Amino acid sequence: MTLWVLGLNHQTAPVDLRERAAFAGDALPRALDSLRILPQVREAALLSTCNRTELYAMADDPQTLVAWLDMHAPGLSGYLYQHRDAEAVRHLFRVATGLDSMVLGEPQILGQVKDAWAVARAHGALGSGLDRLFQQTFSVAKRARTDTRVGANPVSVASTAVRLAQESFARLNESTVLLVGAGETIELAAKHLSEGRVRRLLIANRTLAHAQTLATQHGGVALPLTELDRHLAEADVVFSATAAREPVVTRVQVEQALRTRKRKPMLLFDLAVPRDIEASVAELSDAYLYTVDDLERAVEDNRRSRREAADQAEAIIDLQVARYVETLQANERQAPLKRLRAFGDSTRDELLAKARQQLSNGKPADEVLEQLAHALTNRLLHPPTAALRDAALNNDLDLTSAADRLFPEKPGYRHPPVATPIVRTDDANPAP
C-alpha cells in the first residue's frame, strides 16, 4: 500500500470549485463511509476547510482516488495536486504547521487537521499507518511553532478581514457590525472586533444558544438566523462564515437592505466555503463584497514578513520527514522477520497444545514427541518449500539465491553424535 494525498487549495482552484469540493457537516462522515468500502483503499482521512479539500489515503492506485473525488465534484481532476509517500508526509507536516496556508503560520489549520483525524478515527476509516502519521504530524507542527516564530502574532483570514473593515470605515467604532454564524472563524472575528470596539455588534446564527454565548463574551446582541432580513439593513459591515451548503445572504436581501439604508454603503466579507453570500451581490452599487480569494491578496505582505521564520520551520520539517521515512523503512524491513517469528510461535503453540492434550489422554510420550516433531517440521517448512518449488518452475533466481543464503550447504558437515554415557561395572573393569 502507498500513502497518497490528493487535493486542491486556494493556490490551485478558484473559490467556486473549492466550494463544490467541500465536505460540510454530515457530508464528511458519509464520504468516509463511501471510501471505506472501496477495495483499493485501506485507510482514509478527509481534510476540508474554506481553503482546501484534501484526501489522505493508504491505497494501491491514485486513479481510484481521483475517480472518487471527481464523482463527488465533477471537473476537479484538472485542479488536483498529488503527492505520495515521503512527499505526502512533507505536505501534511507543512499544512499542519501553517506553511501552506493562505495566511502563513495561521493557527486554525492545526485544529482543523486534528478534527479531520478525529472524524476519520471515529468512523473507522483510520488504520495504524495514517493514525501514526497524524500523531507525528501534531508533534512536528507543535515543535515547528514552538522553535520558530512562524506562529507568532499570527494573522488569520478573520483578522485580515477585520483590518480591511477598519481601513474602509475610519470610524468602525461608530458602525454596526453583523456576524452571521458562530463557528471558529466568526469567533475570531468577534474577538478582533471587540478588541477594536464597534458601536453595535449583532450575531445571527441558526442555533441561537451559540450566538448568545458569543454575544455574552463580546458584548453583542444574539439573533436567530430567521431574523436576518429584519436586521441586515442595520449593518454597515457583515462577516459571514457558516457551514451552509446554500447562500444565507442573497442578492435580493442585500438589495432590500440597501434601499432601506438609502444607498448607504455596506461592506460584506464572505469567509465561508461554500460561499455564504451570493456572488452577484458584488454587482450591486454600494455593496462591496470580499471573498476568501480576495483576502489572499491582502495577506501577501504578511506572508513576506514571515518568510524567514517559515524557512526555519521548513528545515525542521525536512529533518522530521527524513526521520519519519527512515523509521517507516526500518519497520518495513523488520516486518517479514516479525511475520516469520509470529508464524513460528503460533505454530509451536498450536501443536504443543495438541501434544499436551494427547499426553493427558494417555498417549505414549515417545509417540507424541515423534508426531510433534514431524508436525512442526512439516508446518514450518511447507511455505518455503512451496515457494521454492514455484520459484524453480518460474526460473525465479532471486528467490532460489535467497534460499541458498538462508539454508547454506556445508559439504561434509555432520551434526556431532550425541554422546552416550559409559556405565562401568565390575565386569567391565579387569582385575588388577
UniProtKB/Swiss-Prot annotation:
Site positions (Important for activity): 91
Gene source species: Xanthomonas campestris pv. campestris (strain ATCC 33913 / DSM 3586 / NCPPB 528 / LMG 568 / P 25)
Entry annotated with the keyword Oxidoreductase: yes
Protein function: Catalyzes the NADPH-dependent reduction of glutamyl-tRNA(Glu) to glutamate 1-semialdehyde (GSA).
Name of this chain's protein: Glutamyl-tRNA reductase
Assembly behavior: Homodimer.
UniProt remark on domains: Possesses an unusual extended V-shaped dimeric structure with each monomer consisting of three distinct domains arranged along a curved 'spinal' alpha-helix. The N-terminal catalytic domain specifically recognizes the glutamate moiety of the substrate. The second domain is the NADPH-binding domain, and the third C-terminal domain is responsible for dimerization.
InterPro entries attached to this UniProt entry: 4pyrrol_synth_GluRdtase (IPR000343), 4pyrrol_synth_GluRdtase_dimer (IPR015896), 4pyrrol_synth_GluRdtase_N (IPR015895), GluRdtase_CS (IPR018214), GluRdtase_dimer_dom_sf (IPR036453), GluRdtase_N_sf (IPR036343), NAD(P)-bd_dom_sf (IPR036291), Shikm_DH/Glu-tRNA_Rdtase (IPR006151)
PROSITE patterns named in the record: GLUTR (PS00747)
Enzyme Commission identifier(s): 1.2.1.70
GO biological process: protoporphyrinogen IX biosynthetic process from glutamate
Catalytic reaction list: (S)-4-amino-5-oxopentanoate + tRNA(Glu) + NADP(+) = L-glutamyl-tRNA(Glu) + NADPH + H(+)
Note: During catalysis, the active site Cys acts as a nucleophile attacking the alpha-carbonyl group of tRNA-bound glutamate with the formation of a thioester intermediate between enzyme and glutamate, and the concomitant release of tRNA(Glu). The thioester intermediate is finally reduced by direct hydride transfer from NADPH, to form the product GSA.
Binding of substrate, residues: 49-52, 101, 106-108, 112
Pathway noted in the entry: Porphyrin-containing compound metabolism; protoporphyrin-IX biosynthesis; 5-aminolevulinate from L-glutamyl-tRNA(Glu): step 1/2
Location of the active site: 50
Key words of the record: NADP, Oxidoreductase, Porphyrin biosynthesis
Claim: NADP is one of the keywords in the record: yes
Region (Disordered) residue spans: 408-432
Binding residues annotated for NADP(+), in chain numbering: 181-186
Pfam families referenced in this protein's UniProt entry, alphabetically: GlutR_dimer (PF00745), GlutR_N (PF05201), Shikimate_DH (PF01488)
Similarity comment text for this entry: Belongs to the glutamyl-tRNA reductase family.
GO molecular function ontology, one term from the record: NADP binding
